[in-house]
């Protein structure tokens, strides 16, 4: 797996869509004939408008995201080809990340470097915990609880660090980049601003659901280890 694929895969896996976020996006997924273009067309227009060098737009099946390594805004087909409010908001949000990248946002650069490392740490920590009974049988020396707990915590703590770094990046992309762009450029009507704001908030809060999922997983592992 290439470094780029690792980053993209880890980013997508780290951002499950929460129930409220999914509802907000689906609620405004109906076509808006008055829209001047689709999500994909808006993304291309904004990239040209803000002179984002070498940034391209393409369709993906891995979830909407911006790839800072390959400089690509990737949108789901349903957002790339759609004139819905959700498509427009999501496209602007992802271009917001491209703008952050061009501006040299240190938080985005830090997250990009952290993701592949955290992904490996998380995977290895879970694998070691899962294989601990087998390791104990082979070595004839059960792994101490403290070591198992430390290994388990390392992966979850690493993922929590990613969430802590990511949340402000997402809110900046939504409310310091996408919303002002859509409002000031008259890409959405004033009557639709509230709906767009809800969609952008949902996009940013997907990381909160990811953090909560990790906390639940951590609690599950602690319970399992305490029973050993």
For each feature predicted by the language model, list its residue ranges.
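Juxtamembrane "helix exit" motif at the C-terminal ends of alpha-helical transmembrane segments
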Residues: 1-3, 125-142, 214-228
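Generic alpha-helix initiation/capping and coil-helix boundary signal
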Residues: 7-8, 36, 145, 166
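Polar-ligand-bearing catalytic/cofactor-coordination segments
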Residues: 21-121, 161-228
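Hydrophobic transmembrane alpha-helical segments that form the core helix bundle
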Residues: 117-176
């Amino acid at each position: 797996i290439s470094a780029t694929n690792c980053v993209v895969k880890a980013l997508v896996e780290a951002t499950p869509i929460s129930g409220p976020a999914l509802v907000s996006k689906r609620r405004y997924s109906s076509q808006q004939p008055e829209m001047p273009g689709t999500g994909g067309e808006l993304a291309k227009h904004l990239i040209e408008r803000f002179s984002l060098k070498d940034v391209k737009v393409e369709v993906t099946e891995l979830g909407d995201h911006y790839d800072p390594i390959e400089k690509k805004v990737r949108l789901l087909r349903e957002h790339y080809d759609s004139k819905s409010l959700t498509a427009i908001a999501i496209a602007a949000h992802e271009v917001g990340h491209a703008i952050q990248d061009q501006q040299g946002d240190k938080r985005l650069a830090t997250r990009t470097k952290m993701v592949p490392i955290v992904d490996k740490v998380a995977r290895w920590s879970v694998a070691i915990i899962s294989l601990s009974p087998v390791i104990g049988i082979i070595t004839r020396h059960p792994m101490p609880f403290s070591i198992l707990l430390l290994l388990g915590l390392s992966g979850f703590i690493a993922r929590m660090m990613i969430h802590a770094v990511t949340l402000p990046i997402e809110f900046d992309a939504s409310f310091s980049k996408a919303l002002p762009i859509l409002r000031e450029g008259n890409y959405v009507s004033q009557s639709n601003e509230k709906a767009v704001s809800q969609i952008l908030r949902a996009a940013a809060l997907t990381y909160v659901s990811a953090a909560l999922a990790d906390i639940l997983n951590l609690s599950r592992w602690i319970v399992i280890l305490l029973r050993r």
